[in-house]
Curated annotation (Swiss-Prot):
Record family assignment: Belongs to the fungal hydrophobin family.
Organism (species): Botryotinia fuckeliana (strain B05.10) (Noble rot fungus)
Keywords: Cell wall, Disulfide bond, Secreted, Signal
The keyword DNA damage belongs to this UniProt entry's keyword annotation: no
Function: Aerial growth, conidiation, and dispersal of filamentous fungi in the environment rely upon a capability of their secreting small amphipathic proteins called hydrophobins (HPBs) with low sequence identity. Class I can self-assemble into an outermost layer of rodlet bundles on aerial cell surfaces, conferring cellular hydrophobicity that supports fungal growth, development and dispersal; whereas Class II form highly ordered films at water-air interfaces through intermolecular interactions but contribute nothing to the rodlet structure.
Main location class: secreted
Keyword Glycoprotein tagged: no
Official protein name in the record: Class I hydrophobin 1
């Protein structure tokens, strides 16, 4: 009897899934939209060429318009560990992910608890 109870307890404990807290990896929640309606999740992969100064150019990331399926995937792998952001669909130019909002983008990644864009550390 004790063996059966111990087996059940161990089986239930093995079913718990832990999500790593590594800052460079983002996890999308499976089963729902991550970006707001009318927005697309994009990889931020190039630096801006605007007149924000050296620091602004290093931290001001442009999002390439790459639609990414966002249900149940690890975004860090899809975006090669680059930051991601939500952008309004449409438009002929790449959305801007930096914080000076000259093209209306949002710097950062997705908060899996609130489904909102958040700033994340950028590894240079």
């Amino acid at each position: 009897m004790r063996f059966s109870i111990a087996t059940v307890v161990l089986s239930l404990a093995a079913m718990v899934v832990a999500i790593p807290t590594t800052e460079s990896t983002l996890f999308a929640r499976g089963g729902g939209q991550t970006c707001a309606q009318g927005q697309t999740l994009s990889c931020c992969q190039s630096v801006t060429s605007g007149g924000d100064g050296i620091l602004g150019n290093l931290l001001g990331l442009n999002c390439a318009e790459i639609p990414i399926p966002i249900v149940g995937i690890v975004l860090g792998g899809k975006c090669n560990s680059a930051p991601v952001c939500c952008n309004v669909n449409g438009g002929s130019t790449s959305p801007d992910c930096d914080d000076n909002s000259n093209n209306g983008g949002t710097q950062g990644g997705i908060n899996v608890l609130t489904n909102s864009c958040v700033a994340i550390p950028i590894v240079l």
